[in-house]
């Protein structure tokens, strides 16, 4: 099955409070995935599969991959309708584009939290660029399993945001523009992209938080090793981060 998502990350921005929160879901999370949808975005048929297959069921980047992935994430986070979750926008980028983006901005520095073959040892400060980004964001065997990989993906996004601030949004966007137009897809308008660039320019990185949704190891009837979400933990997380407890 082609077009499976290596990274699925929800970015929630509060423009009033000037905060940003990243929610990651491991790609092996076992969920209900839409197989077909009508033109209004209603699910017609579904199946249980890894969450990273939703993009593929939608036909990938040139069809409705993003639409299916967004709907799958909405339904997963809603816990069968317990919460009203609406994801408005998406940005998807081909893995080759991610490699090139790393070089477009001159690489980014990260501190290794564990040894990763081809990247560095625990405690090392390493520049992530085209030569080692694949190992850094995709390796899991011997490098902290799926959760270790997700943590590194979040660290990479935070390092990119830091580098963009240091470069200045105008220089950074100019450097990345060619790669973005070639490899990325989004339903954000140009004005919205510019607004986000302005937000990042003045954003305090101390207000960027992250969380990884966890699950329990589970083996499917077909023998696949996957994760089943801890629904009580997910419920608590949704209430804490997305709902006003005083309302």
Where are these regions (language model features)?
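Non-catalytic, solvent-exposed segments at the cell envelope interface
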Residues: 1-247
């Amino acid at each position: 099955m082609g077009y499976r998502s290596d990274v699925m990350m929800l970015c929630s921005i509060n423009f009033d409070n000037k905060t940003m929160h990243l929610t990651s879901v491991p790609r092996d999370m076992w969920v209900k995935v839409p197989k077909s949808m009508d033109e209004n975005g209603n699910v017609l048929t579904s199946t249980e599969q890894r969450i990273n297959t939703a993009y593929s069921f939608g036909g990938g980047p040139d069809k409705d991959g993003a639409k299916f992935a967004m709907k799958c994430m909405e339904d997963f986070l809603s816990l069968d309708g317990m919460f009203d979750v609406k994801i408005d926008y998406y940005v998807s980028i081909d893995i080759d584009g991610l490699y090139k983006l790393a070089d477009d901005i001159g690489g980014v520095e990260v501190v290794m939290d564990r040894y990763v073959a081809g990247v560095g040892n625990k405690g090392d400060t390493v520049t992530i660029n085209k030569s080692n980004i694949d190992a850094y964001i995709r390796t899991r065997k011997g490098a902290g399993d799926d959760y270790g990989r997700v943590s590194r993906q979040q660290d990479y996004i935070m390092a990119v945001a830091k580098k963009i601030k240091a470069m200045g949004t105008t220089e950074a966007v100019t450097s990345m523009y060619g790669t973005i137009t070639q490899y990325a897809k989004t339903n954000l308008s140009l004005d919205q992209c510019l607004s986000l660039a302005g937000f990042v320019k003045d954003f305090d990185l101390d207000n960027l938080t992250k969380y990884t949704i966890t699950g329990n190891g589970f083996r499917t009837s077909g023998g696949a090793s996957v994760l089943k979400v801890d629904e009580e933990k997910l419920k608590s997380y949704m209430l804490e981060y997305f709902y006003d407890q005083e309302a």
